[in-house]
A protein has these predicted regions:
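Subset of outer-membrane beta-barrel
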Residues: 9-479
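Sec/Tat signal peptide C-region and signal peptidase I cleavage site
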Residues: 3-7
Length: 479
């Protein structure tokens, strides 16, 4: 049965009375891990580990010198909490009652995991945004309740380091999931409306060995939720979808986002060091052991042949004795190989942690471009059910960041600034200032999941601008 044509979205300032619109999920503010926030988002050329994957998908395949084994894995958990949301979306506060959007209305959670094998990397990062609006009408009970929105983007990434890891290319699949439900509690007892969208992403970094500079670029094509998974909200005769007293949009869109970045490192600390595995460092000694094993195998075959040639009633017993003798030699060679690799691993690890100069001064710069979104309003416009079109023009955000280890082996500091252009015609760009730090903590192998020398760090960052303030927290490894 065909769905009746829905009403068109009205002019700016009018009440939303139709589902024939989209939410522009573009972010003007920097939302990411503490390092990315502290650098004001200028991390496209510095992306590494889970913390860099949201800026540049090639981060999944970056192999740093801190882990000299053939494999590596990264686990991360970051949170961003806007503690001052007077104008979170830089909309100019021209719609609705800003008191309805409390300081605890918006929250971001970013967990992720990467696994790397030689120069290949795969990973998953989840970028989740939680929004709650108090005072929505539950159509079942006709009582005031809390309308909750979840915008979750799953980044499934893979990448490879070419030219011995100097040219890193990565890409992947993005899954955008929008969930809408009425509940006074954060866990959902059932979604009123849920949609899904699929998209792609691509990133590249060029980090020439021993050079002070690096380059990066990333592209995230437009992503839109077009697959409706569930709809328990009521539907009007015009085909509009209503949850409580809210007209829900037919889709959520993230515009095309492109970034280019550049970084330069000053100081004595080695820049863009190549990744060296323990096997590479011990290659000559391991080759000698391999030669010993091949020679022993030849000797074993010759000796068994001589025993068979002599013959006699106990020939099989003699052959087994020969095999046992050489089995002990092979076990000794295998043990020596393991000891050599462990020694090389410890040497590389110790050299990186203690032998390298710690002082460095890192400058980074990015230029991010956000594309247009047709027939869309901002999240705030949806919250207040008042039309304020968003994404009608392309926006450009220049960003610059600085990082240094101000207290060797104890603390890193970073800071930066970026311009946030508005996605709305009624507002203007604003200037952000950011500050972040890493603090070295304690050693803990997490019940054997990490090496005994693994030392943890606490990371934090703040971001201030007109009518906006946010802080980010995270935990990870100190290197």
């Amino acid at each position: 049965m065909p769905v009746p044509a829905a009403a068109q979205l009205g002019p700016d300032g009018s009440t939303i009375t139709s589902s024939d619109y989209a939410i522009d999920l573009s972010r003007g503010v920097v939302i990411g891990t503490s390092r990315v926030t502290g650098l004001s988002g200028a991390a496209t050329a510095l992306a590494e580990g889970v913390e860099g994957g949201l800026q540049n998908p090639s981060a999944v395949a970056y192999r740093g010198p801190q882990w000299p084994d053939w494999y590596d894995y990264w686990l991360a958990l970051g949170t961003t909490y806007p503690f001052k949301t007077g104008d979170f979306y830089n909309s100019g506060r021209v719609v609705g009652d800003s008191g309805r959007l409390a300081n605890d209305s918006i929250f971001f959670l970013i967990p992720g995991a990467y696994f790397q094998m030689w120069n290949l990397g795969v990973g998953l990062t989840i970028d989740a945004q939680f929004v709650k609006i108090e005072g929505a009408i539950d159509p079942v009970t006709m009582e005031r309740d809390t309308l909750r929105l979840r915008f979750t983007v799953f980044h499934i990434q893979a990448g490879y380091g070419f030219l011995d890891g100097q040219l890193i290319i990565g890409g992947g699949l993005r899954i955008l999931r929008q969930r809408t439900y009425l509940s006074s509690r954060l866990p959902s007892e059932g979604d009123s409306y849920k949609t899904l969208g699929l998209g792609a992403e691509l990133g590249v970094m060029f980090k020439p060995h021993h050079k002070a500079w690096s380059l990066g670029a990333s592209l995230f094509p437009e992503l839109s939720t077009g697959v409706r998974e569930r709809q328990d909200g009521s539907q009007t005769s015009d085909g509009d979808i209503v949850v409580g007293d809210f007209y829900v949009p037919r889709s959520t869109r993230i515009p095309t986002v492109g970034s280019v970045g550049f970084s330069y490192q000053f100081g004595l600390r080695p820049s863009n060091p190549p990744w060296v595995s323990a096997e590479q460092l011990a290659a000559r000694d391991l080759e000698r052991l391999d030669h010993r094993k091949r020679a022993a195998e030849e000797d074993e075959r010759d000796e068994i042949a001589r025993v068979r040639a002599r013959g006699g009633p106990e020939v099989e017993i003699c052959i087994q004795a020969v095999k046992q003798t050489y089995a002990r030699r092979y076990a000794e060679i295998k043990r020596s190989r393991k000891e050599l690799k462990n020694l090389a691993w410890e040497m590389l690890r110790r050299e990186y942690r203690q032998g390298w100069p710690r002082r460095y001064y890192l400058l980074s710069a990015d230029l991010q471009i956000n594309g247009r979104v047709d027939n869309a309003v901002g999240v705030e416009s949806f919250i207040f059910q008042t039309v304020q079109r968003s994404g009608e023009r392309v926006t450009v955000s220049p960003r610059i960041g600085f990082e240094t280890e101000v207290w060797p082996q104890r603390m890193k500091l970073r800071g930066g600034s970026y311009l946030e252009p508005s996605r709305f015609a009624e507002s203007e760009l604003r200037i952000h200032g950011t500050f972040g730090l890493d603090i070295k903590l304690f050693k803990w192998n997490v019940f054997g999941l990490w090496p005994d020398d693994y030392r943890w760090q606490l990371t934090g960052a703040v971001d201030f601008a007109r009518d906006y303030g946010a802080f980010s927290l995270g935990i990870g490894g100190w290197y």
